[in-house]
From Swiss-Prot:
Post-translational modification note: Phosphorylated on tyrosine residues by BCR-ABL.
GO molecular-function term, one example from the UniProt record: four-way junction DNA binding
Keyword flag DNA repair: yes
Tissue distribution of the protein: Expressed in a wide range of tissues.
The gene coding this protein: Rad51b
Protein name according to UniProt: DNA repair protein RAD51 homolog 2
Keyword annotations: ATP-binding, DNA damage, DNA recombination, DNA repair, DNA-binding, Nucleotide-binding, Nucleus
Top-level taxon in the UniProt lineage: Eukaryota
Quaternary structure (record): Part of the BCDX2 complex consisting of RAD51B, RAD51C, RAD51D and XRCC2; the complex has a ring-like structure arranged into a flat disc around a central channel. The BCDX2 subcomplex RAD51B:RAD51C interacts with RAD51. Interacts with SWSAP1; involved in homologous recombination repair. Interacts with HELQ.
């Protein structure tokens, strides 16, 4: 909540403009200053600054509410609770699809379809609500230069040929997907900090970061002293910003992650496990055992609300597992990648 922009907490536009000249643009910036510093910046009296502090503090501190009030508020919310993946069996298991208002992580080895899934979800978010979409824009943050507009158009035309039957509709969908390439942790964090205004001005209904692990693993070598602490600090701040945006605007946020090898006598949790090695017992760990797990560690694993793991079965078939979800049980589905994106085997799309 401290990431909330000052323009959205009731301060006058003139005061916000004055504060922005000192790089004070959100609640955290404002509340980090002393009353004396705020008096110098705003030109207000001590009493005026005290009233501002009360206003800003109240805006970024959520009020207590009962479970019934929370349920009633969400039921009355006009925004959908899920974004359908159009993979019927997966949607059914997830009780509707990718949940709005929380973080969904897609994890797996290279080439298993993480980016394909993200591009497919970008198309779906731009569709009219009558087709299961959110009828909004998408912010696609690409850290690996893996996104291609040609693939976006191919998935759109192949998955919904009856809807995308004109050049105009293809142009509309492609113009709603806003691509941002961020190749450093600093650039990614700055982008996330500026997303709030972009979500409002462009009517964004889906945020994708593909991939969060790419920039982190390039810049933070875990073998160097102090890097783990700095890495977790960056991940915590990034997750906090994304959780705020997801909850404040009731939109889904999709992140992709990579895999790494876990070498330890202690077993990882089921939500982290991607593919056990032959020498790993699932009932008890042994010294020197190894397995493939989601990258970025336990701290990051607790930040995401839903985790889907993609993995290979053979050269053609792949598997998607629901490894972590507040709603769904641990289950898996077999899929292939075709022109229209991901296609579940044995489950026909309507």
């Amino acid at each position: 909540m401290s990431s909330k922009k000052l323009r959205r907490v009731g301060l006058s536009p003139e005061l916000c403009d004055r504060l922005s000249r000192y790089q004070i643009v959100n609640c955290q910036h404002f509340l980090s200053l002393s009353p004396l510093e705020l008096m110098k910046v705003t030109g207000l009296s001590y009493r005026g600054v005290h009233e501002l502090l009360h206003t800003v503090s109240k805006a970024c501190a959520p009020q207590m509410q009962t479970a019934y009030e929370l349920k009633t508020r969400r039921s009355a919310h006009l925004s959908p609770a899920f974004l359908s993946t159009t993979l019927c069996a997966l949607d059914e298991a997830l009780h509707g699809g990718v949940p709005c208002g929380s973080l969904t992580e897609i994890t797996g080895p290279p080439g298993c379809g993480k980016t394909q899934f993200c591009i497919m979800m970008s198309v779906l978010a731009t569709l009219p609500t009558s087709l299961g979409g959110l009828e909004g824009a998408v912010v696609y943050i690409d850290t690996e230069s893996a996104f291609t507009a040609e693939r976006l158009v191919e998935i759109a035309e192949s998955r919904f040929p009856q809807y995308f039957n004109t050049e105009e509709k293809l142009l509309l969908t492609s113009s709603r997907v806003h691509l941002c390439r961020e190749l450093t942790c600093e650039g990614l964090l700055q982008r996330l900090e500026s997303l709030e205004e972009e979500i409002i001005s462009k009517g964004v209904k889906l945020v994708i970061v593909d991939s969060i692990a790419s920039v982190v693993r390039k810049e933070f070598d875990p073998k160097l002293q102090g890097n783990i602490k700095e890495r977790n600090k960056f991940l915590g701040k990034g997750a906090s910003l994304l959780k705020y945006l997801a909850g404040e605007f009731s939109i889904p946020v999709i992140l992709t992650n990579q895999i790494t090898t876990h070498l330890s006598g202690a077993l990882p949790s089921q939500a982290d496990l991607v593919s056990p090695a032959d020498d790993l017992s699932l009932s008890e760990g042994t010294s020197g055992s190894s397995c493939l797990v989601a990258a970025l560690g336990n701290t990051w694993g607790h930040c995401v609300n839903t985790r889907l793991i993609l993995q290979y079965l053979d050269s053609e078939r792949r598997q998607i597992l629901i490894a972590k979800s507040p709603l769904a049980a641990f289950t898996s589905f077999v899929y292939t990648i075709k022109g229209e994106g991901l296609v579940l085997q044995g489950h026909e799309r309507p």
